[in-house]
């Protein structure tokens, strides 16, 4: 029997994961972050976009899904992440594509938090139901299934296939990392399992889907042009997030992440793994630029995506980079009040 839509955990108030900062940690990370942003040197220089028309369309679409997103909720905060991503990373894409990416990001973000929200049992069987044509048991998963099907309207069939595979991997990895045995591998890594950290990160980072989001079929009909850079784009999207999330995750005591797992498998401390991941991000950026050099609108679209993605982290208060001296305070759309 299908579950009756109710006020789910993901629509409950979102509270900060930690109240205070860590001045000592911030001081230690500040030189690395400053150097990282300088060396990354993404061009063209980012210009902020805040489209009221897009906000209107995103809220309209979100309402149509039936997924709760009250203002003072985790769901609404996730929706604003989606809005910001679409508007700032895809600034001159068709509004239909922007709305699609915003809603996808919203729903995927909630699904990615499945363990904390107590919905792992629903999420881990999503793919089975999707492949067998069975209806999903909750309003959230029904909305995400519908969103995945919409991919084929906006992207080349082969690109849509890749986006779908990446999306299903996200849900599988979300369920995998909730398992006790998988969590223990981060604390007690097996010798020789060094690539396990990336194996999980590649899947839960959903970077391939976001790489291809850059190239909808109407504006970018030739998938052959960017495909050589997709692996580096996938890694860039994951690595940059890992580097710029490290401070806020450290404050929250979160150690089950790519940087800490890499450190455990490599036998180094987390600072060393952070430095390496920062350099890997820069190396990915340079290779992508080399592949797309002279490729016209394809090059422009990626450069704007990368620049907007970086600034989304710097500008959104959820990453707390203002405490490290390289970020901004929360904007009005993302402030979640305590109650």
Curated annotation (Swiss-Prot):
InterPro entries hit by this protein: Isoprenoid_synthase_dom_sf, Trichodiene_synth
Region (Disordered): 1-21
Biased composition, class Polar residues, residue ranges: 1-17
Cofactor: Mg(2+); Mn(2+)
Pfam families associated with the record: TRI5 (PF06330)
Keyword flag Protein biosynthesis: no
Biotechnology: Longiborneol synthase CLM1 is a potential target to reduce Fusarium head blight disease. 3D-structure modeling based on known 3D-structure of losely related enzymes has been used for screening of hypothetical inhibitors of CLM1 catalytic activity.
Induction note: Expressed under trichothecene-inducing conditions.
Enzyme class name: lyase
MF (Gene Ontology): carbon-oxygen lyase activity, acting on phosphates; metal ion binding
UniProt pathway: Mycotoxin biosynthesis
Keywords: Lyase, Magnesium, Metal-binding, Virulence
Catalytic activity reported: (2E,6E)-farnesyl diphosphate + H2O = (-)-longiborneol + diphosphate
The protein's Enzyme Commission number: 4.2.3.-
Role, per record: Terpene cyclase involved in the biosynthesis of culmorin, a tricyclic sesquiterpene diol reported to have antifungal activity and some phytotoxicity to wheat coleoptile tissue, contributing to Fusarium head blight disease. The terpene cyclase CLM1 is responsible for the cyclization of farnesyl diphosphate into the intermediate longiborneol.
Family listed: Belongs to the trichodiene synthase family.
Entry protein name: Longiborneol synthase CLM1
Taxonomic lineage of the native organism: Eukaryota, Fungi, Dikarya, Ascomycota, Pezizomycotina
């Amino acid at each position: 029997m299908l579950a009756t839509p109710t006020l789910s955990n993901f629509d409950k108030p979102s509270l900060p994961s930690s109240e205070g900062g860590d001045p000592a940690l911030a001081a230690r990370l500040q030189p690395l972050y400053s150097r990282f942003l300088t060396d990354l040197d993404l061009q063209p220089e980012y210009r902020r976009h805040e489209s009221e028309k897009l906000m209107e369309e995103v809220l309209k679409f979100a309402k149509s899904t039936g997924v709760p997103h009250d203002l003072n909720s985790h769901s609404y905060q996730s929706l604003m992440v989606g809005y910001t991503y679409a508007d700032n990373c895809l600034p001159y894409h068709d509004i239909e594509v922007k709305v699609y990416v915003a809603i996808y990001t919203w729903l995927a973000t909630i699904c990615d938090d499945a363990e904390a929200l107590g919905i792992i049992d629903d999420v881990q069987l999503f793919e089975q139901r999707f492949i067998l044509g069975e209806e999903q048991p909750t309003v959230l998963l029904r909305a995400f299934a519908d969103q995945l099907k919409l991919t084929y309207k906006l992207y080349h069939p082969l690109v849509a296939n890749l986006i779908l595979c990446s999306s299903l991997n996200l849900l599988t990895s979300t369920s995998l990392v909730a398992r006790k045995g998988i969590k223990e591998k981060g604390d007690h890594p097996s010798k020789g399992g060094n690539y396990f950290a990336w194996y999980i990160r590649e899947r839960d980072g959903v970077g391939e889907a976001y790489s291809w989001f850059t190239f909808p079929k109407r504006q970018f009909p030739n998938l052959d042009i960017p495909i050589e850079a997709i692996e580096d784009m996938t890694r860039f999207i994951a690595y940059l997030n890992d580097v710029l999330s490290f401070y806020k995750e450290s404050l929250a005591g979160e150690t089950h992440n790519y940087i800490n797992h890499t450190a455990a498998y490599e036998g180094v401390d987390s600072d060393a793994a952070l430095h390496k991941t920062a350099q890997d991000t820069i190396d990915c950026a340079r290779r992508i630029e080399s592949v797309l050099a002279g490729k016209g609108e394809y090059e422009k679209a990626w450069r704007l995506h990368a620049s907007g993605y970086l600034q989304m982290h710097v500008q959104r208060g959820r990453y707390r980079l203002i405490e490290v001296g390289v970020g901004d305070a929360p904007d009005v759309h993302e402030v979640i009040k305590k109650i």
